[in-house]
Amino acid sequence: METPDETTVRAADSCRESLPERVDGGRVLFGFDGYIDRVREFVSERQSADTYERVPTLDAFAERVNDSVEAESSLTFEWIQDGVRTGGHVSHLARAFDRMGFEPGVVGCLGDPVEEPFVEEFGHLPLETLGSPGYTDAVEFGDGKLMLTEIGALMTLDWAGIESRVGLDRLAELVDGAELVGMGYWSEMPELPDVARGLREELWPTLSDPPETLLLDPGDLRKRGPDVVAAGVEQVSALDDAVRVVVSANRYETRYLARLAGVESDDFGRESQAAFDHLGVSRFAGHGIEEAHLVDEAGTATVGVPRTDDPVLTTSSGDHFNAGLALAHVLDLGRAESLVVGNAVAGHFVRTGSPPTYDELRAFASGYLDYFDAA
């Protein structure tokens, strides 16, 4: 049984009092990726055509790989497709905000023409495509996931590409008056420095009612060289002069950013502070399976995360934390309360496999402390 610490108790109590009974909605915009996710399982042992046992954990998968390496033998896995869904930053956050009663728009790599999974799910929303989507095979385990990704048009997307496909006037129409803009993933977008520059220099000056917040998901920057990341840091920090930039990263993404800042630590809070200092943005959120941190110039908030031993879905739990964090910024909640909302959206998602309605979010946040007892 987990026991929430006093800081988490205070944060949950304050969040329960701070969340409004209902939201008025409003426009939000998400760019610039776009994925079609094929959810899969590895087969451990097959009893019949219809019956099999899956490889239960990443540890079990790693053990098989290591055994094969030690034996100097090749290795074969059978895998089962357990569904197809739209994925990536734009899909997960647009889906979550749509379900909570907002009006999301999507500017992303959705296909030429827009591919059917995106049309089927998001055809009622404003959609602008930037080219071919990426494809991800997401292999689910009880303790995590293995994601095999083909990136698509995002790999070469730059500011000129966005301008030529969407047009500055149309992009301004979608952004002006929006409550928030979300952007992801930096790691899949080598030209992000140029896109951040274009947003700051060419788009934001044209807006009469710009969003107050831009949420940036860096993704796994370990796949990008330090020089590439450094160029992005410079432009992301400069973008913060035009709009409040909130960067949100998981534990291992945060650790990489901290190491780029010269900080080696096993303390998640210290790593989050180092990432914040390195990026030069308004806020940095580090989210993990045990705790989450939100850092800004005024200080740091830390909140415990209620875990579940029986998750329905873990792939994209971080995106759903980001959806809650984004909502909290739209609602202008405090640091600790924002973390509770992020954890509540993610917590509902991993337990049910779908994002919450706003009422379901409020119910989870209201019972936040009870979920520690249920772990």
UniProtKB/Swiss-Prot annotation:
Pathway: Carbohydrate metabolism; fructose metabolism. One of its GO terms (biological process) is fructose metabolic process. InterPro entries: Ribokinase-like. The keyword Kinase applies. Activated in the presence of 0.5 M KCl. 85% activity at 3.5 M KCl. 60% activity without KCl. Its EC number is 2.7.1.3. It comes from the Archaea. Keywords: Carbohydrate metabolism, Kinase, Transferase. It is an enzyme of class 2 (transferase). Beta-D-fructose binds at residue 319. Signal peptide: none annotated. One of its GO terms (molecular function) is identical protein binding. Disruption phenotype: Grows as wild-type on sucrose. It catalyses: beta-D-fructose + ATP = beta-D-fructose 1-phosphate + ADP + H(+). Gene3D superfamilies: 3.40.1190.20. Belongs to the carbohydrate kinase PfkB family. Homodimer. Catalyzes the ATP-dependent phosphorylation of the ketose sugar fructose to fructose-1-phosphate. Does not produce fructose-6-phosphate. The sugars D-glucose, D-galactose, L-rhamnose, D-xylose, L-arabinose and D-ribose are not substrates of this enzyme. This is Ketohexokinase. It comes from Haloferax volcanii (strain ATCC 29605 / DSM 3757 / JCM 8879 / NBRC 14742 / NCIMB 2012 / VKM B-1768 / DS2).
